[in-house]
Design a protein with these regions (language model features):
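Conserved, structured core segments of small domains
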Residues: 1-98
Length: 98
């Protein structure tokens, strides 16, 4: 297994409070996509971070060795629509509640 902390970086610091209607739709699809990966056991947890300098998203991934983290995050609807990007940080291990 491989483990990653993934940070979703929105296109602007004030993205969350200033989303257009289309961006709101894409964010809803983004949340549904991450929850689907959670249900598949590929994500351990995900959610928004309310940083005063600008909000962003964090996801903890636990994926099989033969899967590519960039391939998974590139299929996120918000990324497919050109709104923001992911940063991927490998972790040595991940311990979580069962």
């Amino acid at each position: 297994m491989k483990y990653y902390l993934c940070k979703f970086v929105p296109p602007r610091a004030d993205f969350l409070p200033t989303m257009s209607e289309k961006e709101q739709q894409w964010m809803k699809a983004h949340g549904a996509y991450l929850t689907e990966l959670l249900d598949q056991g590929l994500i351990v947890a995900h959610g928004p971070v309310m940083d005063p300098a600008g909000g962003y998203g964090v996801s903890l991934f636990q994926i099989p060795d033969d899967q590519d983290i960039a391939a998974l995050t590139s299929k996120d609807p918000i990324v497919l629509n050109g709104v923001g990007h992911y940063e991927h940080y490998p972790m040595l291990h991940l311990t979580s509640r069962q």
